[in-house]
């Protein structure tokens, strides 16, 4: 089964990101991961037909093009050694010139039936032994380097494959070892998983590895439902004209994201706020330090998105539920929703009203 790779030549028109109505939590989580991929991806859980796949594809269409080494299966960065394949890195060390081109940020769909070899890549052992060369067939992780790897119904994916994806997403590298032969290549991507909670949850150990967890539901307001239906009908009738009507807002958001990524390094969080973030994590009995780290990163990304260089209490309040709700221990006797519990503790520690 082949993966679907989104390219600039893609025939199917994509619904504009700025035209998507509602689902603010999901959209914010995706934008923050684009600004700082080290947040660690996002898990989107929600009902069927709530726009999960549409929003992810719309995000990719929104992103600016990137410069890559020509004819390189790993989308190697021409100047950053951490994002180069071994072959490109060796050429650079030898002082050889490399040709570059620009391309849309890749989006790779991971099919549910994918095998580990299809995901990680394979080594041709026979060719390696007879010809003495490392014959490597890149997998989906190679294609997703510097892009987005999207797994729909990730809660139905084999746990071992989810582990492989999360390991690569965290380290930025994929290592394939067969019969004493080892190949390593960059695999730095934003991992986006989506699923329907009715079809089962991820194991807590795996869920904790996702940076953020967005919950979305079916829109209930009749007026909003009518607006969504009408927008979709207009898009289906004339996609080109519909997309043109959102060109200005799309370009504005693309520019905002580019500026936010450049601004991110300048953003600072006061020590007192960092202590309070850790206090919230401690009082919620969050295991490990991932929650602290991700919350700090996400708050900085939000400040950068809104054009500021310092994190505010409001920034933390807007993202802390996204960063912590999936890290709480499940208590069968607990009646309060995990997101509400996070906001409750946040308001006590920070002395604010719950958002």
Curated annotation (Swiss-Prot):
EC number assigned by the record: 6.6.1.1
Activity modulation comment: Redox regulation; active in reducing conditions, inactive in oxidizing conditions. Thioredoxins f and m mediate the reversible reductive activation of oxidized CHLI.
Protein name in UniProt: Magnesium-chelatase subunit ChlI
One annotated GO biological process: chlorophyll biosynthetic process
UniProt source species: Nephroselmis olivacea (Green alga)
PANTHER family associated with the record: MAGNESIUM-CHELATASE SUBUNIT CHLI, MAGNESIUM-CHELATASE SUBUNIT CHLI-2, CHLOROPLASTIC
Gene that this polypeptide is encoded by: chlI
Binding site for ATP: 46-53
Record keywords: ATP-binding, Chlorophyll biosynthesis, Chloroplast, Disulfide bond, Ligase, Nucleotide-binding, Photosynthesis, Plastid
A single Gene Ontology CC term: chloroplast stroma
Pathway participation: Porphyrin-containing compound metabolism; chlorophyll biosynthesis
InterPro entries listed in its UniProt record: AAA+_ATPase, CHLI-like, ChlI/MoxR_AAA_lid, Mg_chelatase_ATPase-isu, Mg_chelatse_chII-like_cat_dom, P-loop_NTPase
Gene3D superfamilies: Magnesium chelatase subunit I, C-Terminal domain (1.10.8.80), P-loop containing nucleotide triphosphate hydrolases (3.40.50.300)
NCBIfam families: BchI-ChlI
Reactions the enzyme catalyzes: protoporphyrin IX + Mg(2+) + ATP + H2O = Mg-protoporphyrin IX + ADP + phosphate + 3 H(+)
Family (UniProt): Belongs to the Mg-chelatase subunits D/I family.
């Amino acid at each position: 089964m082949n993966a679907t790779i989104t390219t600039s030549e893609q025939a199917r028109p994509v619904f504009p990101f700025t035209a998507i109505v509602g689902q603010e939590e999901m959209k914010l989580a995706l934008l923050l991961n684009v600004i700082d991929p080290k947040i660690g991806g996002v898990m989107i859980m929600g009902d069927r037909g709530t726009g999960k796949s549409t929003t992810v594809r719309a995000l990719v269409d929104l992103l600016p093009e990137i410069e890559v080494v020509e004819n390189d299966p790993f989308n190697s960065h021409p100047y950053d050694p951490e994002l180069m394949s071994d072959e490109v890195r060796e050429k650079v060390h030898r002082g050889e010139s490399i040709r570059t081109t620009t391309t849309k940020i890749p989006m790779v769909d991971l099919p549910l039936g994918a095998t580990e070899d299809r995901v990680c890549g394979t080594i041709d052992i026979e060719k390696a032994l007879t010809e003495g060369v490392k014959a490597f067939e890149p997998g989906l992780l190679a294609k997703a380097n510097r892009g987005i790897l999207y797994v729909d119904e990730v809660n139905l994916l084999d746990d071992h494959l989810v582990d492989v994806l999360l390991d690569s997403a965290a380290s930025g590298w994929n290592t394939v070892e067969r019969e004493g032969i080892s190949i390593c290549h960059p695999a730095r991507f934003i991992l986006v998983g989506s699923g329907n909670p009715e079809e089962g949850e991820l194991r807590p150990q795996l869920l904790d590895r996702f940076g953020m967890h967005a919950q979305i539901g079916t829109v209930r307001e009749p007026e909003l439902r009518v607006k969504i239906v009408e927008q979709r009908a207009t898009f289906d009738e004339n996609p080109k004209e519909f997309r043109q009507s959102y060109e200005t807002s799309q370009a504005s958001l693309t520019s905002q994201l580019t500026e936010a990524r450049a601004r991110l390094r300048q953003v600072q969080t006061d020590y007192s706020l960092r202590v309070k973030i850790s206090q919230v994590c401690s009082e919620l009995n969050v295991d490990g330090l991932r929650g602290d780290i991700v919350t700090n990163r996400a708050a900085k990304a939000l400040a950068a998105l809104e054009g500021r260089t310092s994190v505010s209490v409001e920034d933390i309040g807007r993202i802390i539920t996204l960063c912590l709700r999936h890290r709480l221990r499940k208590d069968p006797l607990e009646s309060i929703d995990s997101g509400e519990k996070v906001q409750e503790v946040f308001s006590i520690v920070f002395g604010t009203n719950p958002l």
